[in-house]
Design a protein with these regions (language model features):
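Conserved loop-alpha-helix segment in the C-terminal half of the alpha/beta-hydrolase fold
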Residues: 178-211, 223-225
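Active-site nucleophile elbow and catalytic-triad environment of alpha/beta-hydrolase enzymes
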Residues: 148-166
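Active-site loop/oxyanion-hole signature of alpha/beta-hydrolase fold enzymes
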Residues: 30-71, 88, 114-117
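Flexible "cap/lid" loop of the alpha/beta hydrolase fold
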Residues: 88-94, 98-130, 183-192, 235
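Gly/Ala-rich beta-loop-alpha elbow adjacent to hydrolase catalytic centers
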Residues: 74-79, 83
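Conserved HGGG/HGGXW glycine-rich cap/lid loop of the alpha/beta-hydrolase fold
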Residues: 2-43
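Short beta-strand/loop motif that positions the catalytic acidic residue
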Residues: 174-176
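Short, proline-enriched alpha-helix->beta-strand connector loops that line the catalytic pocket
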Residues: 166-172, 196-198
Length: 240
């Protein structure tokens, strides 16, 4: 049976999946939702993050140590940088990659380039502080407050490294959130793919879907685990 490896986005930790995880476990799946180095309960180690490989090495070690196979690898938001690079590292271990409102640069592009390449790169040791979330749309005040208490800074170094291509043999599912604002890296990814005529899934929810729409996210992930090539039999595709 497949196993899920869930990778959170910027400023968050493994806790970001806690509302999705029970649905996957109830369906009989093993689920791993680690906090990246320097995030969540590991935020005090942010200074050890030297680049994208710091995160990829960390997750690859988990996959190999636990001998995970047939992995449904899920990256949300900035987590898309990590899952894309991990897929290039360990394609033989994967069932598929699910890009959930994820920042996915073109091969060889950097995460920071999705924001428009800066004239001068920020210092690699910079840790960007989080901005408090504001309730609105599908993010209620209680959830926003709970998340704000757990947000942490995000090392910028991984966003300064080029991201490799996902090998062609690894199936990919792209799902975007309708409520994601213009300018978000994941929105840039969505708009690029739409302009190229790609057929992706659009979820009617905000960017923090794992917290605000866990039932919907779980349904997407379970459908991907069953048959990533047939995702559009369950979720209506959108295209440019």
């Amino acid at each position: 049976m497949s196993v899920f490896l869930l990778v959170h986005g910027a400023f968050r930790g493994g806790w970001a999946w806690q509302r999705v995880r029970p649905h996957l476990v109830a369906a009989g799946y093993d689920v791993h939702a680690p906090s990246l180095l320097g995030a969540g309960e590991r935020s005090s180690y942010a200074g050890q993050v030297r680049g994208l490989d710091s995160w990829v090495d960390d997750l690859a070690a988990l996959v190999l140590a636990e001998d995970l196979r047939d992995v449904v690898l899920v990256g949300h938001s900035q987590g898309g940088l990590v899952t894309t690079a991990l897929a290039a590292r360990l394609p033989e271990r994967l069932r598929c990659v699910v890009h959930l409102d994820a920042a996915v640069p073109r091969p060889g592009e950097r995460g920071i380039d999705l924001l428009g390449a800066p004239a001068v790169d920020p210092a690699r040791d910079l840790v960007v502080p989080p901005r408090p979330l504001v309730a609105g749309d599908d993010l209620d005040e209680r959830t926003a407050a709970w998340m704000n208490a757990r947000l942490c800074g995000t090392p910028v170094a991984p966003s300064l490294d080029p991201v490799p291509a996902v090998p062609a043999e690894v199936p990919q599912v792209f799902a975007f959130c309708a409520g994601t604002p213009e300018g978000y890296p994941s929105r840039v990814t969505r708009d690029r793919r739409a302009a190229a005529g790609e057929s992706d899934v659009l979820l009617e929810c905000g960017h923090d879907a794992p917290m605000t729409a866990p039932d919907l996210v779980a349904a997407l992930l379970l459908a991907a685990a069953r048959s990533p090539h047939d995702i559009h039999q369950t979720f209506t595709p959108i295209s440019g």
